[in-house]
Amino acid sequence: MPFSFASFRSIALLAALGFVWAAAVSAQQFDGPGRAWMRKVRIAAYPLTSTNADEIVRQAQASGVYGIEVDNDIPGRYESLLDPAEKLEAIRRVAVAAHRVGNKAYVYIAGLECISKDADGPHTLAKQHPDWLQRKITGEPAMFGAKSAFWIRPGEEDVWVSPYAEPWRTIYMQRVRQIAGTGIDGIYVDIPYWMTHFTGWEDSWASFDDATVAAFRKETGLDARKDIRLGDPEDPGFRKWIDFRIRTIDDFLAEIRRNAVAVNPAMALIPEIYPGIEEAAPRVGADVYQLYPLVDAIAHEYEFGDGDDHTAASRTPFDWFMYQIGMRSFRAFGDEKKPTWILNYSWDGAPHVQPREAMLTLASSELVAGANVWDASGHVMSGSNNMPARTEIFHWIAAHEDIFSAIRQPLGATGVYFSDQTRNYYPAEFVASYRGVLLMLLQNHVQFRIVTPGTLQHFDGKVLVLPDVRVLSEEQAAGVRRFAARGGRVVLTGTADHRLDSMKNATRFTDHPETRFLNRALKDFYASDPASEPALLQAIATDSDVRVDASRNVVVHEAVLGGRTCLFLANFSGLQAGQNETPVVQTNIRITTGPKLGRTLHVLPFLGTERVVEGKPNGATVEFSLPPLERGAVVWFQ
């Protein structure tokens, strides 16, 4: 039905009461026993109707799913935005069904997208509320049809709403509170983006609707339509526009969570975000580095690079390492505690790769990086490319939940600094440098920790690498100087922020050796040499209590779990995009440690069973020979 001002007044009153309640619980803990389930999830998604709640839960239980995502979008469909009663009842039913068997469920809702079912009819969001829409600087509204995205059906109107459209936002938050009242365990917010990701909008830096422009002017005194040079990182106005857009999305998601926990203090908020560490983050305005402290988990539909096929079956070996770098970064952004859910796709018709093989390599790679697994059929959120394989993977993860749901404390005396502001303003330069340093460390089996502006003051390692970090606040620069004053070695590559010019003892590599190495690996991964930049490697490498002798195509992450030192290994040897996603088995992997870690090694291969390897004393060290490594393994000392 058309939106009425009478209904708006009622909603506004409820909203005001809700915000009072939300303020009372604003200090709600993000972590704790009530949210421990989020580190244990093995995810699958199901379309929810008014009649299929029990069947969804039955199917989920049968394949080992824990943490059921259901699709029954209320605010993302204009009709249910206005009248949510039927969908709210369906959500209540699936929550009851999931809880009856000890499972958890959370419901999908759109962020800033809203679809009206009849684009030609009079009752669409765009027709009734054109002032709610995001717009290009030219005034063109963010309104689309079926040709723009696969999820838009013929005859539907798809629009993207400004988060500053206050009447819409009031209704939206009321719907959030109603959803929280159903007993569902979480709200899964998809695509909370500024419209910059559909064809023709990539460089728009939207939105320039009246409400957004007014909010920016109030905050900065600048007219976004006239006073900024879009795309110019040297322009202070454009930098303010980038920061404003990111902060707006942060505030939107934080408000969703406040409203949800006001009704149900145990409610979880999980945004789905596809940009990771790359330039898409400032472009769409959803920066996972900034979002992790504000939400309970992030579901990363993580992909990057050119082309449309980012499935596991089509990944190059270089890609596999870049995904490791991304996932390790996400874990650091969440302080290693907030769960990282990875919605990646294993296979979508690659003729030379078996779906099961791609699924296994993908799942193994995510587990060793500390992420939760979510694979689906093709490029949709639901289904599976091979249900028996998914069932096998999920049951194995469940059997070893004590390992894969535990909080990890990464080990390593080398720290690599992630600068969100540098990435926001100079993404190409920073990301290449950051990846180059981390790839060099990974392939040389040097353990590292990712350091962020939020964890810099606590970093107690020996070496801190700043890869082309061009933008630091005074506080951040002071933190780097304090690290050096404590005896730490600071390594600066590329262009460093001028605030570090006075650091005479810093080791500098202004000619970008890390980027040279990255480019060689990108061009021919197997022919590139991770020791080809010896001066840089010597400057950033540090020793560890554990030394691993293995192929450079084997990734090793060292961490402490519950007081025990563990190694997580992933094998990417022999992989070829679109041809082979089954790694070549690795033999003769040796691990050398000091005696204090013990002389017994436990080895748990991916999808296998635990076995014990006894170490051989060799002077002051103990040496272990691992059994053949297929895809991945976890090992720990005793």
Give names to the regions the model predicted.
Residues 111-182, 221-243, 253-254:
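Active-site-adjacent "subsite" loops/lids of carbohydrate-active enzymes
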Residues 41-45, 68-70, 105-108, 187-189, ...:
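Hydrophobic faces of well-ordered beta-strands that scaffold small-molecule active sites
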Residues 167-294:
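Active-site neighborhood of glycoside hydrolase catalytic domains
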Residues 51-76, 181-186, 297-298, 362-373, ...:
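Catalytic domains of carbohydrate-active enzymes, especially glycoside hydrolases
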Residues 45-62, 166-179, 280-290, 355-363:
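Short, acidic/polar
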Residues 14-116, 120-126, 140-143, 170, ...:
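Mature N-terminal, pre-catalytic/accessory segment of carbohydrate-active enzymes
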